[in-house]
A protein has these predicted regions:
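Glycine-/small-residue-rich "gating" segment that lines the acyl/pantetheine channel
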Residues: 114-121, 159-162, 166, 182-238, ...
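Flexible, low-complexity linker/loop segments at domain and module junctions
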Residues: 85-88, 280-286, 317, 365-402
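Conserved beta-ketoacyl condensing-enzyme motif
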Residues: 11-15, 19-152, 181-190, 286-300
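A glycine- and small-aliphatic-rich helix-loop capping segment at beta-alpha/alpha-beta transitions
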Residues: 12-16, 103-117, 167-170, 190-203, ...
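Active-site-adjacent elements of ketosynthase-type condensing enzymes
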Residues: 33-43, 100-104, 183-209, 251-271, ...
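Active-site-proximal alpha-helical scaffold in enzymes
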Residues: 68-81, 130-134, 138-182, 220-241, ...
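Condensing-enzyme catalytic core mediating Claisen C-C bond formation in acyl metabolism
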Residues: 22-26, 204-280, 289, 402
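ACP-dependent fatty acid/polyketide chain-elongation machinery
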Residues: 1-57, 234-246, 341-355, 398-402
Length: 402
Protein backbone atom coordinates (compact mmCIF):
# COMPACT_ATOMS: atom_id res chain seq x y z
CA UNK A 1 0.00 0.00 0.00
CA UNK A 2 1.08 3.58 -0.58
CA UNK A 3 -0.26 6.93 0.59
CA UNK A 4 0.41 10.64 0.14
CA UNK A 5 -1.93 12.46 2.54
CA UNK A 6 -2.37 15.68 4.52
CA UNK A 7 -1.10 13.91 7.66
CA UNK A 8 1.76 11.89 6.22
CA UNK A 9 3.49 10.95 3.00
CA UNK A 10 3.64 7.20 3.59
CA UNK A 11 1.24 4.61 4.97
CA UNK A 12 3.26 4.46 8.19
CA UNK A 13 3.17 8.24 8.73
CA UNK A 14 -0.49 8.40 7.78
CA UNK A 15 -1.49 5.56 10.09
CA UNK A 16 0.50 6.94 13.02
CA UNK A 17 -1.30 10.24 12.48
CA UNK A 18 -4.67 8.48 12.45
CA UNK A 19 -3.95 6.75 15.76
CA UNK A 20 -2.79 10.05 17.27
CA UNK A 21 -5.97 11.81 16.13
CA UNK A 22 -3.85 14.22 14.10
CA UNK A 23 -5.61 16.60 11.73
CA UNK A 24 -4.18 17.99 8.50
CA UNK A 25 -6.15 21.24 8.35
CA UNK A 26 -4.60 24.67 8.04
CA UNK A 27 -4.71 27.93 6.11
CA UNK A 28 -4.58 27.55 2.33
CA UNK A 29 -1.06 28.36 1.12
CA UNK A 30 -1.41 27.81 -2.63
CA UNK A 31 -3.08 31.17 -3.29
CA UNK A 32 -4.30 34.32 -1.54
CA UNK A 33 -7.68 33.65 0.07
CA UNK A 34 -8.42 37.27 1.03
CA UNK A 35 -11.51 37.34 -1.20
CA UNK A 36 -12.66 33.82 -0.30
CA UNK A 37 -15.00 32.76 2.49
CA UNK A 38 -13.20 29.41 2.70
CA UNK A 39 -9.79 29.80 4.32
CA UNK A 40 -8.83 26.24 5.29
CA UNK A 41 -7.82 23.12 3.41
CA UNK A 42 -5.98 19.88 4.08
CA UNK A 43 -2.83 20.28 2.00
CA UNK A 44 -0.10 17.70 1.52
CA UNK A 45 3.07 18.91 3.24
CA UNK A 46 6.74 18.47 2.31
CA UNK A 47 6.07 16.45 -0.84
CA UNK A 48 9.07 16.12 -3.17
CA UNK A 49 8.17 14.40 -6.45
CA UNK A 50 11.83 13.85 -7.30
CA UNK A 51 11.95 11.17 -4.59
CA UNK A 52 9.84 9.09 -6.98
CA UNK A 53 10.83 10.30 -10.47
CA UNK A 54 13.45 12.37 -12.24
CA UNK A 55 13.06 16.13 -12.63
CA UNK A 56 12.10 15.91 -16.29
CA UNK A 57 9.27 13.49 -15.55
CA UNK A 58 8.09 15.64 -12.64
CA UNK A 59 7.91 18.71 -14.90
CA UNK A 60 5.73 16.79 -17.35
CA UNK A 61 3.17 15.81 -14.70
CA UNK A 62 0.62 17.83 -12.80
CA UNK A 63 0.49 17.34 -9.06
CA UNK A 64 -2.41 14.85 -9.09
CA UNK A 65 -0.27 12.58 -11.29
CA UNK A 66 2.83 13.09 -9.15
CA UNK A 67 0.85 12.04 -6.08
CA UNK A 68 -0.41 8.92 -7.87
CA UNK A 69 3.00 7.87 -9.17
CA UNK A 70 4.48 8.35 -5.69
CA UNK A 71 1.75 6.35 -3.91
CA UNK A 72 1.88 3.62 -6.56
CA UNK A 73 5.65 3.37 -6.21
CA UNK A 74 5.31 2.93 -2.46
CA UNK A 75 2.62 0.27 -2.94
CA UNK A 76 4.57 -1.72 -5.52
CA UNK A 77 7.67 -1.66 -3.31
CA UNK A 78 5.63 -2.66 -0.26
CA UNK A 79 4.10 -5.55 -2.21
CA UNK A 80 7.53 -6.78 -3.31
CA UNK A 81 6.17 -6.88 -6.86
CA UNK A 82 9.03 -7.42 -9.32
CA UNK A 83 7.75 -6.69 -12.81
CA UNK A 84 10.56 -8.63 -14.47
CA UNK A 85 9.07 -11.75 -12.87
CA UNK A 86 5.49 -11.02 -14.01
CA UNK A 87 3.64 -11.10 -17.31
CA UNK A 88 3.25 -7.32 -17.74
CA UNK A 89 0.03 -7.81 -19.70
CA UNK A 90 -1.52 -9.44 -16.62
CA UNK A 91 -0.63 -6.52 -14.34
CA UNK A 92 -3.06 -3.64 -14.78
CA UNK A 93 -3.81 -0.21 -13.38
CA UNK A 94 -7.01 1.36 -12.08
CA UNK A 95 -6.14 4.75 -10.61
CA UNK A 96 -8.83 7.39 -10.90
CA UNK A 97 -9.10 11.13 -10.42
CA UNK A 98 -12.39 12.92 -10.04
CA UNK A 99 -11.27 16.18 -11.63
CA UNK A 100 -7.80 16.01 -13.18
CA UNK A 101 -5.75 19.19 -13.19
CA UNK A 102 -7.56 22.43 -12.45
CA UNK A 103 -4.11 24.00 -12.14
CA UNK A 104 -3.32 23.36 -15.80
CA UNK A 105 -6.67 24.73 -16.91
CA UNK A 106 -6.33 27.88 -14.82
CA UNK A 107 -2.76 28.47 -15.93
CA UNK A 108 -3.43 28.04 -19.64
CA UNK A 109 -6.70 29.98 -19.56
CA UNK A 110 -4.79 32.95 -18.13
CA UNK A 111 -2.28 32.57 -20.97
CA UNK A 112 -5.10 32.40 -23.52
CA UNK A 113 -6.66 35.63 -22.25
CA UNK A 114 -3.35 37.47 -21.96
CA UNK A 115 -1.52 36.28 -25.07
CA UNK A 116 -4.08 34.70 -27.37
CA UNK A 117 -4.89 31.13 -28.46
CA UNK A 118 -1.60 30.64 -30.27
CA UNK A 119 0.27 30.76 -26.98
CA UNK A 120 -1.64 28.01 -25.19
CA UNK A 121 0.83 25.27 -24.31
CA UNK A 122 0.86 22.07 -26.38
CA UNK A 123 0.94 20.00 -23.18
CA UNK A 124 -2.31 21.43 -21.79
CA UNK A 125 -4.53 18.51 -22.75
CA UNK A 126 -2.23 15.65 -21.67
CA UNK A 127 -1.45 17.49 -18.44
CA UNK A 128 -5.09 18.24 -17.68
CA UNK A 129 -7.09 15.10 -18.40
CA UNK A 130 -7.85 12.84 -15.46
CA UNK A 131 -6.85 9.55 -17.11
CA UNK A 132 -3.22 10.66 -17.02
CA UNK A 133 -2.95 9.42 -13.44
CA UNK A 134 -3.45 5.84 -14.62
CA UNK A 135 -1.40 6.56 -17.73
CA UNK A 136 1.60 7.88 -15.83
CA UNK A 137 1.47 5.10 -13.24
CA UNK A 138 1.40 2.49 -16.01
CA UNK A 139 4.29 4.15 -17.84
CA UNK A 140 6.38 4.60 -14.70
CA UNK A 141 6.12 0.98 -13.60
CA UNK A 142 5.62 -0.94 -16.84
CA UNK A 143 2.04 -2.04 -16.22
CA UNK A 144 0.76 -3.27 -19.60
CA UNK A 145 -2.53 -4.87 -18.55
CA UNK A 146 -5.95 -3.25 -18.41
CA UNK A 147 -5.63 0.45 -17.57
CA UNK A 148 -8.69 2.27 -16.24
CA UNK A 149 -9.60 5.77 -15.15
CA UNK A 150 -12.88 5.70 -13.26
CA UNK A 151 -14.49 9.12 -12.73
CA UNK A 152 -17.38 9.09 -10.26
CA UNK A 153 -16.64 12.27 -8.33
CA UNK A 154 -16.25 11.52 -4.61
CA UNK A 155 -16.71 7.76 -5.18
CA UNK A 156 -13.83 7.53 -7.69
CA UNK A 157 -11.28 5.86 -5.41
CA UNK A 158 -13.73 3.23 -4.21
CA UNK A 159 -15.02 2.45 -7.70
CA UNK A 160 -11.42 2.27 -8.97
CA UNK A 161 -10.52 -0.39 -6.41
CA UNK A 162 -13.81 -2.18 -6.98
CA UNK A 163 -13.34 -2.33 -10.75
CA UNK A 164 -9.79 -3.60 -10.23
CA UNK A 165 -11.23 -6.33 -8.00
CA UNK A 166 -13.72 -7.28 -10.70
CA UNK A 167 -10.97 -7.32 -13.33
CA UNK A 168 -9.07 -9.91 -11.30
CA UNK A 169 -12.24 -11.92 -10.68
CA UNK A 170 -12.95 -12.03 -14.42
CA UNK A 171 -9.45 -13.39 -15.03
CA UNK A 172 -8.32 -10.35 -16.99
CA UNK A 173 -5.42 -9.66 -14.61
CA UNK A 174 -3.41 -11.37 -11.89
CA UNK A 175 -2.49 -8.08 -10.26
CA UNK A 176 -4.05 -4.60 -10.33
CA UNK A 177 -2.46 -1.42 -9.01
CA UNK A 178 -5.51 0.52 -7.86
CA UNK A 179 -6.55 3.67 -6.05
CA UNK A 180 -7.34 7.34 -6.43
CA UNK A 181 -5.65 10.71 -6.54
CA UNK A 182 -6.62 14.39 -6.44
CA UNK A 183 -5.15 17.86 -6.22
CA UNK A 184 -7.83 20.52 -6.59
CA UNK A 185 -7.03 23.11 -3.93
CA UNK A 186 -6.99 25.94 -6.47
CA UNK A 187 -8.81 29.26 -6.85
CA UNK A 188 -11.52 27.85 -9.11
CA UNK A 189 -11.75 24.61 -7.14
CA UNK A 190 -12.32 26.36 -3.83
CA UNK A 191 -14.61 28.98 -5.40
CA UNK A 192 -16.70 26.35 -7.15
CA UNK A 193 -17.25 24.12 -4.14
CA UNK A 194 -17.86 27.23 -2.00
CA UNK A 195 -20.57 28.35 -4.43
CA UNK A 196 -22.24 24.97 -3.90
CA UNK A 197 -22.14 25.69 -0.13
CA UNK A 198 -20.36 22.34 0.18
CA UNK A 199 -17.28 23.66 2.01
CA UNK A 200 -16.91 24.61 5.64
CA UNK A 201 -16.24 28.29 6.16
CA UNK A 202 -14.94 27.74 9.69
CA UNK A 203 -11.53 29.26 10.38
CA UNK A 204 -10.97 26.97 13.37
CA UNK A 205 -9.09 23.85 12.19
CA UNK A 206 -10.53 21.87 15.10
CA UNK A 207 -14.14 22.70 14.19
CA UNK A 208 -14.03 22.64 10.40
CA UNK A 209 -14.35 18.97 9.41
CA UNK A 210 -16.61 17.49 12.08
CA UNK A 211 -18.63 14.63 10.55
CA UNK A 212 -21.92 13.77 12.28
CA UNK A 213 -21.60 16.68 14.72
CA UNK A 214 -24.64 18.94 15.07
CA UNK A 215 -22.45 21.97 14.24
CA UNK A 216 -21.11 20.55 10.96
CA UNK A 217 -21.35 23.02 8.09
CA UNK A 218 -19.45 21.54 5.15
CA UNK A 219 -16.34 19.61 4.24
CA UNK A 220 -12.70 20.68 4.15
CA UNK A 221 -11.06 19.99 0.81
CA UNK A 222 -8.05 17.70 1.00
CA UNK A 223 -5.58 16.38 -1.54
CA UNK A 224 -3.32 13.38 -2.00
CA UNK A 225 -3.40 9.82 -3.20
CA UNK A 226 -3.65 6.26 -1.97
CA UNK A 227 -2.84 3.19 -4.05
CA UNK A 228 -2.94 -0.51 -3.23
CA UNK A 229 -1.74 -3.64 -4.98
CA UNK A 230 -4.65 -6.05 -5.41
CA UNK A 231 -3.68 -9.59 -6.29
CA UNK A 232 -5.41 -12.88 -7.00
CA UNK A 233 -4.99 -14.91 -3.82
CA UNK A 234 -3.20 -17.97 -5.23
CA UNK A 235 -0.90 -15.74 -7.28
CA UNK A 236 0.01 -13.83 -4.13
CA UNK A 237 0.66 -17.04 -2.20
CA UNK A 238 2.89 -18.46 -4.93
CA UNK A 239 5.23 -15.50 -4.80
CA UNK A 240 5.17 -15.23 -1.01
CA UNK A 241 3.53 -11.82 -0.92
CA UNK A 242 2.59 -10.04 2.29
CA UNK A 243 -1.20 -10.21 2.54
CA UNK A 244 -2.75 -7.51 4.71
CA UNK A 245 -6.44 -8.31 4.16
CA UNK A 246 -8.87 -9.78 1.65
CA UNK A 247 -11.26 -7.77 -0.50
CA UNK A 248 -14.36 -9.95 -0.77
CA UNK A 249 -17.27 -7.70 -1.74
CA UNK A 250 -18.09 -4.78 -4.03
CA UNK A 251 -21.49 -3.14 -4.29
CA UNK A 252 -22.72 -0.21 -6.36
CA UNK A 253 -25.89 1.71 -7.10
CA UNK A 254 -27.12 5.02 -8.45
CA UNK A 255 -29.52 7.30 -6.60
CA UNK A 256 -30.92 8.65 -9.90
CA UNK A 257 -32.13 11.54 -7.76
CA UNK A 258 -30.08 14.76 -7.81
CA UNK A 259 -26.76 16.02 -9.18
CA UNK A 260 -25.27 16.83 -5.77
CA UNK A 261 -27.54 15.54 -2.98
CA UNK A 262 -27.77 11.89 -1.97
CA UNK A 263 -31.25 10.35 -1.95
CA UNK A 264 -32.96 11.59 1.20
CA UNK A 265 -34.17 8.15 2.27
CA UNK A 266 -30.70 6.62 1.86
CA UNK A 267 -32.01 3.87 -0.43
CA UNK A 268 -29.20 4.09 -2.97
CA UNK A 269 -26.37 3.90 -0.44
CA UNK A 270 -28.21 1.15 1.46
CA UNK A 271 -28.42 -0.89 -1.74
CA UNK A 272 -24.68 -0.48 -2.39
CA UNK A 273 -23.86 -1.68 1.14
CA UNK A 274 -26.17 -4.68 0.91
CA UNK A 275 -24.81 -5.54 -2.54
CA UNK A 276 -21.26 -5.57 -1.16
CA UNK A 277 -22.29 -7.85 1.70
CA UNK A 278 -24.15 -10.15 -0.69
CA UNK A 279 -21.16 -10.24 -3.04
CA UNK A 280 -18.95 -11.27 -0.12
CA UNK A 281 -21.41 -13.82 1.24
CA UNK A 282 -21.49 -12.07 4.62
CA UNK A 283 -24.69 -11.68 6.64
CA UNK A 284 -25.32 -8.08 7.78
CA UNK A 285 -25.17 -9.07 11.46
CA UNK A 286 -21.61 -10.36 10.98
CA UNK A 287 -20.40 -6.83 10.28
CA UNK A 288 -19.21 -4.73 13.22
CA UNK A 289 -17.66 -1.66 11.58
CA UNK A 290 -18.32 0.84 8.78
CA UNK A 291 -15.94 3.52 7.52
CA UNK A 292 -18.54 6.07 6.48
CA UNK A 293 -18.36 8.55 3.62
CA UNK A 294 -18.97 11.03 6.46
CA UNK A 295 -18.21 14.32 4.73
CA UNK A 296 -19.33 16.76 7.46
CA UNK A 297 -22.08 18.22 5.25
CA UNK A 298 -25.59 18.39 6.65
CA UNK A 299 -27.17 16.29 3.89
CA UNK A 300 -24.52 13.57 3.54
CA UNK A 301 -24.21 12.68 7.20
CA UNK A 302 -27.97 12.65 7.74
CA UNK A 303 -28.81 10.67 4.60
CA UNK A 304 -25.93 8.22 5.10
CA UNK A 305 -27.21 7.58 8.62
CA UNK A 306 -30.63 6.86 7.15
CA UNK A 307 -28.99 4.51 4.64
CA UNK A 308 -27.25 2.53 7.38
CA UNK A 309 -30.51 2.23 9.33
CA UNK A 310 -32.35 1.16 6.17
CA UNK A 311 -29.73 -1.49 5.35
CA UNK A 312 -29.24 -2.89 8.86
CA UNK A 313 -32.45 -2.12 10.74
CA UNK A 314 -32.11 -2.24 14.52
CA UNK A 315 -28.68 -3.83 14.14
CA UNK A 316 -27.41 -0.44 12.94
CA UNK A 317 -27.22 0.57 16.61
CA UNK A 318 -24.65 -2.17 17.26
CA UNK A 319 -22.29 -0.98 14.51
CA UNK A 320 -19.24 1.20 15.04
CA UNK A 321 -19.14 3.96 12.41
CA UNK A 322 -16.36 6.49 11.90
CA UNK A 323 -15.17 9.07 9.38
CA UNK A 324 -11.53 9.36 8.36
CA UNK A 325 -12.41 12.75 6.82
CA UNK A 326 -12.45 14.12 10.36
CA UNK A 327 -8.64 14.09 10.12
CA UNK A 328 -7.71 14.43 6.43
CA UNK A 329 -10.71 16.23 4.99
CA UNK A 330 -12.36 15.23 1.73
CA UNK A 331 -9.82 14.09 -0.86
CA UNK A 332 -12.53 13.88 -3.56
CA UNK A 333 -11.39 11.24 -6.06
CA UNK A 334 -8.75 9.95 -3.64
CA UNK A 335 -11.04 9.78 -0.60
CA UNK A 336 -12.26 6.22 -1.05
CA UNK A 337 -8.76 4.90 -1.61
CA UNK A 338 -7.39 6.59 1.52
CA UNK A 339 -10.31 5.20 3.51
CA UNK A 340 -9.72 1.72 2.04
CA UNK A 341 -6.13 1.84 3.31
CA UNK A 342 -7.49 2.95 6.69
CA UNK A 343 -9.78 -0.08 6.83
CA UNK A 344 -6.93 -2.43 5.95
CA UNK A 345 -4.82 -1.05 8.80
CA UNK A 346 -7.73 -1.21 11.22
CA UNK A 347 -8.33 -4.87 10.36
CA UNK A 348 -4.62 -5.63 10.57
CA UNK A 349 -4.10 -3.99 13.96
CA UNK A 350 -7.50 -4.49 15.59
CA UNK A 351 -8.06 -0.77 16.03
CA UNK A 352 -11.00 1.47 15.08
CA UNK A 353 -10.12 5.15 15.03
CA UNK A 354 -12.28 7.83 16.56
CA UNK A 355 -14.16 10.52 14.64
CA UNK A 356 -12.12 13.55 15.66
CA UNK A 357 -14.05 16.68 16.63
CA UNK A 358 -17.33 14.88 17.28
CA UNK A 359 -18.96 16.42 20.35
CA UNK A 360 -22.74 16.35 20.07
CA UNK A 361 -25.13 14.98 17.47
CA UNK A 362 -28.67 15.93 16.52
CA UNK A 363 -31.68 13.76 17.30
CA UNK A 364 -31.77 11.64 14.13
CA UNK A 365 -28.01 11.03 14.17
CA UNK A 366 -28.17 8.52 17.01
CA UNK A 367 -25.78 5.75 15.94
CA UNK A 368 -22.31 5.03 17.36
CA UNK A 369 -20.06 7.38 15.38
CA UNK A 370 -16.97 6.57 17.47
CA UNK A 371 -16.34 9.50 19.75
CA UNK A 372 -13.59 7.28 21.12
CA UNK A 373 -11.23 4.80 19.48
CA UNK A 374 -11.60 1.06 20.06
CA UNK A 375 -9.07 -1.71 20.35
CA UNK A 376 -10.86 -4.86 19.25
CA UNK A 377 -10.88 -7.56 16.61
CA UNK A 378 -12.15 -6.28 13.26
CA UNK A 379 -13.14 -9.36 11.25
CA UNK A 380 -14.85 -7.33 8.50
CA UNK A 381 -14.88 -3.69 7.43
CA UNK A 382 -17.28 -1.96 5.06
CA UNK A 383 -16.25 1.33 3.48
CA UNK A 384 -18.68 3.68 1.72
CA UNK A 385 -18.29 6.39 -0.89
CA UNK A 386 -21.12 8.55 -2.24
CA UNK A 387 -20.35 10.76 -5.23
CA UNK A 388 -22.01 13.77 -6.82
CA UNK A 389 -24.38 12.51 -9.49
CA UNK A 390 -25.68 9.77 -7.20
CA UNK A 391 -22.76 7.36 -7.57
CA UNK A 392 -22.66 4.96 -4.60
CA UNK A 393 -19.98 2.34 -3.95
CA UNK A 394 -19.12 0.09 -1.03
CA UNK A 395 -16.23 -2.32 -0.51
CA UNK A 396 -16.17 -5.19 1.98
CA UNK A 397 -12.86 -6.28 3.46
CA UNK A 398 -12.09 -9.35 5.55
CA UNK A 399 -9.28 -10.20 7.94
CA UNK A 400 -6.87 -12.55 6.19
CA UNK A 401 -6.45 -15.94 7.82
CA UNK A 402 -3.70 -18.20 6.50
Amino acid sequence: MGAITPIGNSVEEFWNGIKEGKTGFGPITYFDTADYRCKLAAEVKDFDPTQYMDKKSARRMEQFCQFAVAAAGQAIADAGLIMEQEDPYMVGCSVGSGIGSLQAMEREYDRLKEKGPGRVGPMLVPLMISNMAAGNVSIAYGLKGKSLNVVTACATGTHSIGEAYRTIQYGDADVMVAGGTESSITPIGIAGFSALTALSFSEDPQRASIPFDKDRNGFVMGEGSAVVVLEELEHAKRRGAKIYAELIGYGCSSDAYHITSPAEDGSGAATAMLNALKDGGVAPEKLTYINAHGTSTHHNDLFETRAIKLAFGEYAYDLKINSTKSMVGHLLGAAGAVEFVTCVKEIQEGYIHRTVGLRETEEELDLNYCRDSYEEEVPYALTNSLGFGGHNASLLLKKYME
